[in-house]
Amino acid sequence: MVDKLVNSEANARRIQMVENCFGTSGQQLLVPGRVLVGEGVLTKMCRKRPKARQFFLFNDILVYGNIVIGKKKYNKQHLIPLEEVQLQALEDNGQYRNGWLIRTATKSFAVYAATQTEKQEWMAHINKCIEDLLRKSGKKPVETHAAVWVPDSEATICMHCKKTQFTMINRRHHCRNCGAVVCGPCSSKKFMLPGQSNKPLRVCLDCYDNLKSMKRDGNKALAGNNNKPANSTESSGEDDSGDDEETLKDNVTHDEPKFYADGKLEK
């Protein structure tokens, strides 16, 4: 079905509309061979709190951004190549329901749909796009993924020393290897994590010792594949730290997601 939409006027019109909603702050999305597979609002677990984000699934990339004016204007556009993506379903945990992890080599985070049905639809469509993309390119799935970050609100004290309380002076920091919230002294070391950056990144003391030991022992296991539980509701990346600028805040009217490649909508 996706292949039938490649050269359709409806597909080009939809992609152009997405471009217009992001304005000059966004990148060009209308390129040969690209299809808009689906779109909708998901709740993204950001560093400080859960926030509504508009997501657009294309056959080769996943795009999301802040909602400034519902269905009319978005900003802070993020593009994720689907060939780098791996999904991991999350179990329901209290108020956090219908969620899954979106994991890549440079950034990993949790998102939540409004219903179980929408979760299944999103995951099925994303996985189908990933499978088709990898099959056509002949590439293998990425095996190394960035750690998801524990939200600031989940830690009132350092997760490493278990002593330091976070205040205006004692700031929170995140270990780039395991995602834990730690204090400054417990994250004073840096280590190269090639999948995330070409510069040494802040890591906690435990991860630093483990990574250094692996390097010394000649272990080829790649850094970044932490062993956090699948029910984690964390977010990685610093790009969300200043996301509170959005106009709509959390007052976003929910509409069911639209998927154009399943034949149910007008082509």
Residue ranges and their predicted role:
Residues M1-N170, H174-A180, G184-S188, L201, ...:
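Membrane- and cytoskeleton-facing regulatory interfaces of eukaryotic small-GTPase pathways
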Residues S197:
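Flexible phosphate/Mg2+-sensing switch loops adjacent to catalytic phosphate-binding sites
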